[in-house]
Amino acid sequence: MSQIKNPFSEILSAYSAAIFEKDVDRYLSLYSDDILIFDMWNDWYLQGLQPWREMAENWFASLNSEKVVVTASEIQSHQFEDFVVGYAILRFAAIDAEGHELRYLNNRVSINMRQADGNWKIFHQHSSAPIDGKSIQVMFHMDDV
């Protein structure tokens, strides 16, 4: 029985593994050189692999002995010949060396990928979380909604 490969699901799996291992090179291998990131943290946007590398190096180093487990839900994607757009809710859970969950947050992600030389690469990634209209606070947990 053959299985149909879903490039978006494969990228999410590789993304989760690279983050769990805190492997900067593996993480960056998912992205095209001309990546444009609209991230939730610190900057309005990041353009290119070098700023994204610096972000990843700083993030992974800040974790010390903690690891981050990324799980995806509500996954949807649309594939065209050499283009994929996908959407998901990501849960980032920090765990200690014994595997105990310390904290977590959710965020929404939209990813655009294109195929080059037989490989799918992310060329645009946008992450967000809703803002409560009354408190003007970011809602980092889906159960806050």
Tell me the role of every PLM-derived stretch.
Residues S2-R26, L36-V145:
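A beta-strand edge to alpha-helix "cap/lid" segment located at domain peripheries
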